Amino acid sequence: AHAAGALLLMDNPWATALLFRPFEHGVDIVIEAATKYIGGHADVMLGTITVSTAEQFQTVKWTANALGNCPGPDDCYLALRGLRTLSVRLERHQRNANVLARWLRERDEVGRVLYPALPDDPGHELWKRDFKGASGLFGVVLNAYPKKAVAKMLDGMELFAMGASWGGYESLMIPTHPGKNRTATKWRGPGPSLRLHAGLEDPDDMIEDLEKGLARLTKAS
């Protein structure tokens, strides 16, 4: 990007600045959904833009002023509240995600687990080189199951709610369709894909919920 005279912008909600330092890797502008891990309680709608130079800050400030972008004081208060516990929550999210990811990859119903903190993940070496940790968000590719079976699995989950905005204290699970979004490479997966967010609940309770869900998946196939 820099060789072509362009600025490099990065979206960094998965790791946050605690687990990945974009400016140390040549990034110029960092955006992040503060709705997710910064807020941490699924009760705020907020985004952040962080820049590396004073000149960029003036440009962003002028643009925000011209567009009338102004977060409410309550939203800012909730984000500041979340920042106080961010490091503690991320540590728990990572620990729970590791437990779930390792458990899921041993299941016969699962074809692949997409989580760079796993030693056998294709991106593990890059993650280990550049990141200081992992968060609670990861993907699961099931083996070949019909949509009705996946729906049956999801409908009966108790701890894992269905929700798009991850990063809060609760665990979430939704179906995903990576094949529809790929442009550079073709998606190859043995079956349906799920996106999981490991919340702050007890991992044993989450595993019990997943085990029952996978049983429904198999029974409905």
Question: What are these language model-derived features?
Answer:
Residues 60, 149-153, 206-210:
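Hydrophobic side chains in well-ordered alpha-helices
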Residues 98-158, 164-167, 178-188:
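Conserved small-domain helix->loop->beta segment predominantly found in fold-type I
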Residues 67-68, 155-165, 213-221:
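A common structural junction motif
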Residues 14-16, 119, 170:
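Active-site-proximal loop/turn and secondary-structure-junction residues that shape catalytic pockets
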Residues 79-88, 135-144, 194-199:
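Short, well-ordered beta-strand elements within core beta-sheets of diverse protein domains
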Residues 144, 171-221:
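PLP-dependent enzyme catalytic core of the Aspartate aminotransferase-like
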Residues 1-109, 114:
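Conserved PLP-enzyme active-site core in the AAT-like
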